[in-house]
Curated annotation (Swiss-Prot):
Family: Belongs to the class I-like SAM-binding methyltransferase superfamily. TRM5/TYW2 family.
Region Disordered, annotated ranges: 283-362
Keyword Ribosomal protein: no
Coiled-coil spans in chain: none
Originating organism: Sorghum bicolor
Amino acids binding S-adenosyl-L-methionine: 189, 227-228, 255-256, 371
HAMAP family: TRM5
Protein name: tRNA (guanine(37)-N(1))-methyltransferase
Gene Ontology CC: cytoplasm; mitochondrial matrix; nucleus
One function term, GO molecular function aspect: tRNA methyltransferase activity
Oligomer and partners: Monomer.
Reactions this protein catalyses: guanosine(37) in tRNA + S-adenosyl-L-methionine = N(1)-methylguanosine(37) in tRNA + S-adenosyl-L-homocysteine + H(+)
Main function: Specifically methylates the N1 position of guanosine-37 in various cytoplasmic and mitochondrial tRNAs. Methylation is not dependent on the nature of the nucleoside 5' of the target nucleoside. This is the first step in the biosynthesis of wybutosine (yW), a modified base adjacent to the anticodon of tRNAs and required for accurate decoding.
Amino acid sequence: MEKLDESKFEQRLQLWALRIPRELSSAVTRLLRSGYLLDKPRVKTVVEDPEGDKNRLVILSEKIQKPDLSDMPQQELDSLKQLCNVDVVPYTLTLGYSYWSAGHVAHLNISDDLLPYKNVIAKVIYDKNYPRIQTVANKVGTITNEFRVPKFEILAGKNDMVTEVKQYGATFKLDYGLVYWNSRLDHEHIRLVSLFKKGDVICDMFAGIGPFAIPAAQKGCVVYANDLNPDSVHYLRTNAKINKVDDYIFAYNMDARVFMQNLMTVPGLETGSDCQVAADESYPKEGVPANENSSSNGNHNDVREGSQNGANESSVASTTAKKRQQTSEECESDCQDGDASQTKRRNNKRVRGPGPPPSKPWEHFDHVLMNLPASALQFLDCFDGLVQKKYWTGSLPWIHCYCFIRSSESEESILSNKLNAKIAEPIFHRVRDVAPNKAMFCLSFKLPMECLREDDSENHIESVA
């Protein structure tokens, strides 16, 4: 048997920590426990200071990105300075081989040469980690289904893939056999959400069970979240309710192109037969607030209801837009001042405020998330002519598109002919290596002005149909 290289499982997080007198550890953690401390299972937030015994290091959350602590509200910062002199130091956290699991499920990806020993490997993992680990599953084959969900073989323990994962102050319920989840991407989720501001409107085209949508809603953003997988949308709604942000998340279950077209349909705008958007009739056409038709332990059919209503695509888009407008009018009160994420407590209190601010996405949205690295680039062309210039207000949105880039490919080749417009100053953030010659990146850029259309012509939609 080849020796297991445990270093391949390591992930290093570059964080910030506060060096404080050890006698103030409890006071500081009480002050920062409302979302500003590192929140990872089995990881201590207060650790020894390698430079001396008189001090301790308090590890800060991933969302604290700046050493001057300007990410933190001034009130908390002032209270902290009253306690002691603030000494901010860099801190590297290494999450090693023994850390990775999803709730009670240990997910393995055993290489071909070790497959003869798979049962032995699984039994050792199960025996040494029970009861924390109650199911050991191995990924089987390559992902080929349309929902990008891997197949698993249960090697040890009970056949129960429904579990809960806690990350950055949020709880995610999922069925590992029905939806996609990667515990190693939590740092990337926080990195991107840290770019959002309270009140921002977010369009999540491939939302999954909510790894971006939930923390964005906790921050006070309005999130239009879509996924093609009905099971993912079921757990997205469930997780929105668990984390008490269901008033901020509107869940859709449809093709991503149709999702964006529906959001950008202006209420009352007449559409001709040439601009009808083709959609798969097996999916409902209307976005539903996450607090409707949802149950954390209910039947998954809740996301499939309405798929047989027989309405044509153009009337559906108009109905959806009118429903959004009605919802916006019911929420005219502005959110209370202060970051909504401050109100998130470990007992999972509902985000404070009267609900999300009015949102008309055909007039303005701030960020679009495209977290489907295997094929998201193919959807960039849906932004060509999507936004009507005469209705748009404010600055153009940021697009965040995840993709894989091989060592033989260049960033220029990735961008060519994807949007039918020149992308100015694209930002490529390297997320992680997925193979020796392949890495996952997040491409971020402002939507070019050339992508806006000048009039009500919908000829561009032919490419979406």
